[in-house]
Amino acid sequence: LFSKLSERLGRVREKWGIQALFSERSRNGISWESLEEVLIAGDVGVTMTERVIDTLRAKVSVSGPDVDPAKLLSVVLRDMLLEVKGTGEPIRFSSAPTAVLLVGVNGSGKTTTAAKLSWNLGREGRKTILAAADTFRAGAVEQLRIWGERAGARVVSHPSKGDPGAVVFDAIKATEARGCDCLIVDTAGRLHNRDNLMEEMARVSGIIDKNCAGWVRESFLVIDAVSGQNGLKQVEAFGKVVPLTGLVMTKYDHTAKGGVILSAGHELGVPVRYIGLGEGMEDLVLFHPGEFVEALIADVRKEV
C-alpha cells in the first residue's frame, strides 16, 4: 500500500515540496511563512494550517538542534488525522445486514465507489446488493450494472426516471431475501445548494431507516479530491440532511493539492474512511493516516 500511495501522491508531493522547503533550514532556519504558504496553497485550509504550524513550532522548540522538521511534521499531521474518531475504519458489520448510502455532488465518483466497495467486501467473503437509485442521469443504471458485474454483485434497478425510493425499498427486500451482508445505495448526484434534491435524498435515507430496523447504517459522502476547500462546504451541507458516518475521497491521483483530506475530518468531525487512488477496483483503499502522511512528505517512513 505504501508504494502505491507514494506513486499516486507524486503530484501532490511535488507541488508541496516539503523536503525542499526544509532542506534550506540548515542555512536560513525554518521559514514558517513559506510553510504556511505551502499548506494553504495545498488546500489544507487556514484554520488547519495555523494549528499545524503552532503544533510544529512547539515540537521544534523542545527538540534538539539536529531534529528533522519534516519528520516532526509527518508526526503532527498523522496525529491530527487520528484524533478524528473513526478515521480509516472499514464498513461496520454485525449479525444484521449493513446499509451503506452514498451521497455527493455530480461527478464525484459515487457509482464507481459503490462497485469498488462491493468488490472489496467480496474479497472478504461478503455478499452485497447494489441499488441503482440514480434514476435520473442518463446511463447511470447501465453504468452501475456494468460496474456491478465487474465487482460480482447483483444490481437492483428500475426503469429510467423511476422513483429512487422504490428502488431502495426493493433492494432492501432483495438483500434480506438473498441473505446478503451489505446493501450499497448509489444515489443521483446533486448540488448541495438545491433544496428539492436534498429533500429527495433525505427521503431515501428515511426509507432505509424505516425498513432496516436493526441494520448497521453507514452514510458516506463521496468527495472528488480535486474539489479542494469546496469539499468542506459539501460536508457541511450534506451533513445537515443525512447523518454522515464517513468520507470517501476519490480521484486523489488526479490532484496536485489534496490538503482538504487533512482538514475535512478535523473541522467538521466526519472521518475519512476510504481514499481513491485510481480507476481499478483495487484502487479504493482504506485511509491509513500514517502511511498517507509518509507518502505525502516522503523520506520519513523509517523514523515515524
Kindly label every feature range from the protein language model:
Residues 1-102, 117-119, 123-130, 150, ...:
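Non-catalytic terminal/linker segments enriched in charged/polar, low-complexity residues
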